[in-house]
Design a protein with these regions (language model features):
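N-lobe entry segment of adenylate-forming
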Residues: 1-58, 63, 82
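Conserved pre-ATP/AMP-binding loop-to-beta segment of ANL
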Residues: 21-24, 147-165, 171-172, 198-209
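Conserved AMP-binding A3 loop
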Residues: 38-42, 161-188
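Conserved AMP-binding/adenylate-forming
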Residues: 39, 52-98, 212-213
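Conserved structural elements of the adenylate-forming
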Residues: 45-53, 157, 176-202
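AMP-binding/adenylate-forming catalytic core of the ANL superfamily
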Residues: 115, 344, 354, 359-360, ...
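Conserved AMP-binding/adenylation subdomain of ANL enzymes
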Residues: 184-209, 216-257, 261-273, 280
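Gly/Ser/Thr-rich phosphate-binding loop
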Residues: 254-258, 266-328, 341
């Protein structure tokens, strides 16, 4: 059994410095030298102590002050994460690929005491320097400091610990406030995933590594800095998705968190007999979106242990986990965790209650009240149904519903899943066009007729009220927000 901890202090002083001190914590591939660097937990913890010393020495009265990380995945990112928290600061994760309009809004909202950046230009370097030059800091500032001898206990269990921004598709992003209690309540679910892998392999001493290509401002990657230290396992951190095949061979990885586009790429390798390209990978953890059940079933029947996690930034990524590998249930998001409460509203909206629910949206009590009711239920905005075996299946997003004059409700995600099965379709968005259900399709110009024919055939299988009667084409990728989600407006 893996021991579940409930605070950052113990994670570093017990797990990193004692239980797993001789195990590898993090690996990085350096394209320039073609070398892999492996860092053991004891050395990782020593650098975390340096970071604590650095922040406490250079930011007076740091308790509660906002410190932003604005950079790509790196070892320094991981070290500063724990250093900021243990020193008493509030860690703010920012997406370096956002526009200056979005970044300046988020920076202005949190009013940071410091912004750590790697110095690379992601398109906003000049504006960042002009507006915040006096508080910009390099990522490796901690290296010049001696490790703090006595690790401080600065964090209240229910204090604000981390600020992460949602990736809204219809308006400004919101700052999600997460506490230590929020974060560590989720560790039970992540430890359970580890134990299920042990059961699957019939090996209670199983030690694995996870490859992460997702950016650290993405909760699915970031939370692994905490969860994998529970089992003394390693994170293999990608520097560039373009080096995927080389990195996953040079840094043997059994587990990988995936979004649909990555899962589809892995699926092609498996189905075309190129599984060896994936090295030791056997556990894709699917999160952040709805996945094609057939793709997951294909992976499961070809030796992969497919895990799905359902959650939101507002639930600290917690929610429901699905371990089912059978055709009937692999398309579900799971049966629910025993430490959370669930209910379906009359309109089908899924609601969740428990310790992982956020403190609220930063400086936005009105928006908080819209999603967390007086009884503590978080309204996910996702529509779902529950089958006779207790499995929850997502059916769409409440705010995306198209409501026809006839009163019928249309889930665009359902129709997008149908259109997306056409091989010529690269991306698509279903929306209301006047009084019609329409679809915007990104595909090659010479494939447009193929797509029209596919939609015509698909419509014949649908009820009249669900049929797509307007089709528009784009020869360019469809617009997305800073987190890569398709915009629907």
């Amino acid at each position: 059994m893996i021991k579940v901890l409930d605070n950052v202090y113990d994670l570093v002083t017990l797990n990193m410095e004692q239980r797993f001190s001789e195990r590898v914590a993090l690996r990085f591939y350096d394209k320039e030298t073609d070398e892999v660097t492996a860092v053991h937990y004891k050395d990782y913890a020593r650098d975390i102590r340096r970071a604590v010393s650095y922040f406490q020495s250079t930011i007076p009265d740091i308790k509660g002050k906002k410190i932003c990380l604005l950079n790509k995945n790196s070892y320094e990112y991981a070290v500063n994460t724990f250093g900021i928290i243990l020193a008493g600061g509030v860690l703010v994760l920012l997406n370096q690929h956002k526009s200056w309009d979005e970044l300046s809004y988020e920076l202005g909202l949190v009013d940071p005491a410091a912004v750590l950046t790697d110095g690379d230009d992601y398109g906003t370097k000049e504006q960042l320097q002009a507006a915040y030059g006096s508080i910009l800091r390099p990522m490796d500032g901690f290296r010049a400091y001696e490790p703090v001898a006595e690790m401080p206990r600065c964090i209240g269990h229910d204090d604000l610990m981390i600020l992460m921004f949602t990736s809204g598709t219809t308006g400004r992003s919101k700052g999600v406030m997460l506490s230590e209690r929020n974060f560590f309540s989720v560790m039970r679910a992540h430890v359970q995933i580890g134990e299920r892998m042990m059961e699957y392999k019939h090996d209670p001493e199983l030690v694995v590594s996870q490859y992460t290509v997702l950016p650290m401002f993405h909760l699915g990657a970031f939370i692994c800095l905490f969860s994998w230290a529970h089992g003394g396992w390693a994170l293999n951190i990608s520097g560039d998705i373009r080096n995927f095949y080389k990195e996953i061979r040079r840094m043997p990885s059994q587990v990988m968190a995936v979004v649909p586009v990555i899962m589809n790429s892995l699926h092609k390798d498996v189905m075309r007999g190129r599984k060896e390209r994936l090295g030791e990978l056997w556990v894709p953890i699917c999160s952040s979106a709805m996945f094609d059940p057939q793709v997951m079933l294909d992976m499961a029947t070809n030796g992969m242990f497919v895990v799905q996690t359902y959650g939101a930034t507002e639930t600290c990524g917690d929610g429901i986990i699905n371990y089912a590998q059978d055709a009937k249930h692999i398309g579900a998001v799971g049966q629910g965790n025993d430490y959370l409460d669930y209910k379906l509203e009359p309109d089908g909206e899924l609601c969740i209650r428990g310790d992982s629910i956020m403190l609220g949206y930063y400086k936005d009590p009105e928006a908080t009240a819209e999603v967390i009711d007086a009884d503590g239920w978080f309204h996910t905005g996702d529509l779902a149904r529950k089958d006779e075996d207790g499995y929850y299946f997502l059916t769409g997003r409440k705010k995306n519903l198209i409501i026809l004059d006839s009163g019928e409700n249309i889930s665009p995600e359902e129709l997008e899943g149908i259109v997306g099965k056409c091989e010529a379709v690269k991306e698509c968005v279903v929306k209301e066009m006047g009084k019609k259900i329409g679809v915007v399709v990104y595909c090659d110009e010479d494939k447009q007729q193929q797509v029209r024919d596919f939609i015509t055939e698909a419509n014949r299988t649908l009820p009249l009220y669900k049929r797509m009667s307007a089709v528009e084409f784009s020869t360019e990728p469809l617009p997305r927000n800073g987190a890569g989600k398709l915009l629907r407006q």
